[in-house]
């Protein structure tokens, strides 16, 4: 774990996957457990804030930027300029300012990790709209409960298999939901049948099954007894952060 003082109001903490494993935490686990998030954040703050300049401040805020190697945690006692500070600290010299798709997914993860106030509607089962522009054209289908769909639930032996699938699996007319149940990850694929042919759906599922198994459990059971970590655009979100 590395700590850098960005300015008098902000600390950046780089936490690698090894550090997370030692604490028994994975990035995606944080998305579904608000109490675990808060406990984790304050444990990091206690370690790095040896002068107690932040711990004694009621206005302290946190923001997380997950990546494949772990995550960056920004701790600030002045949230007004936090976004600008993070942008300057993380933007490479050749990085374009045109990062709409990154902002879309970052906002999604920020809402899930920080439970910030937004006008977005949360239903207790995940966010109500897509986090990336990749799925914006599916909004009419997602909003219509009568839309004909075909669903498959996949179970992964390890999270890395899910990451590998997300990198190459880009079907048209698909929504994807990620669940965690009994320490296993499950992915629900929801195909909109008027967006894909039966043959195409069959081929897409065959590709997915190279990385996973068909699960003998329904999405309804996962929703009731497990955790829904990502809604509608799980594949896009994983693809973005685990490159």
UniProtKB/Swiss-Prot annotation:
Q: Which InterPro entries match?
A: MecA_C_sf, Neg-reg_MecA
What family is this?
Belongs to the MecA family.
Subunit and interaction comment: Homodimer.
Fetch the Pfam families from UniProt: MecA
Q: What name appears for this protein in its UniProt entry?
A: Adapter protein MecA
The entry's function note states:
Enables the recognition and targeting of unfolded and aggregated proteins to the ClpC protease or to other proteins involved in proteolysis.
> What's a single GO MF annotation on this record?
protein-macromolecule adaptor activity
- What's said on domains? The N-terminal domain probably binds unfolded/aggregated proteins; the C-terminal domain interacts with ClpC.
HAMAP family cross-referenced by the UniProt entry: MecA (MF_01124)
Q: Where is this region: Disordered?
A: 119-140
């Amino acid at each position: 774990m590395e700590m850098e003082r960005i300015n008098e109001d902000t600390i950046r903490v780089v936490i690698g996957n090894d550090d997370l494993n030692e604490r028994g935490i994975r990035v995606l686990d944080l998305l579904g457990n608000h109490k675990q998030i808060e406990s984790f954040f304050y444990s990091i703050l206690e370690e790095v804030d040896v002068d107690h300049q932040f711990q004694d401040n009621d206005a302290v805020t946190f923001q997380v930027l997950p990546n494949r190697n772990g995550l960056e945690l920004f701790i600030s006692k002045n949230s007004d300029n936090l976004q600008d500070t993070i942008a300057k600290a993380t933007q490479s010299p050749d990085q374009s300012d045109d990062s709409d798709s990154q902002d879309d997914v970052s906002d999604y993860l920020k809402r899930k990790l920080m439970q910030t106030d937004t006008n977005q509607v949360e239903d207790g089962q995940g966010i109500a709209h897509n986090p990336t522009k990749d799925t914006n054209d599916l909004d009419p289908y997602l909003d219509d409960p009568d839309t004909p769909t075909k669903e498959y639930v996949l179970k992964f032996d390890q999270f890395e298999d899910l990451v590998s699938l997300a990198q190459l699996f880009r079907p048209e007319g698909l929504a994807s939901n990620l669940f965690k149940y009994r320490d296993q990850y499950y992915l629900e694929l929801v195909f909109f049948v008027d967006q894909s042919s039966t043959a195409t759906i069959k081929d897409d599922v065959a590709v997915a099954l190279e990385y996973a198994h068909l699960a003998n459990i329904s999405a309804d059971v996962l929703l009731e007894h497990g955790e829904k970590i990502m809604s509608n655009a799980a594949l896009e979100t994983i693809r973005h952060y685990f490159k």
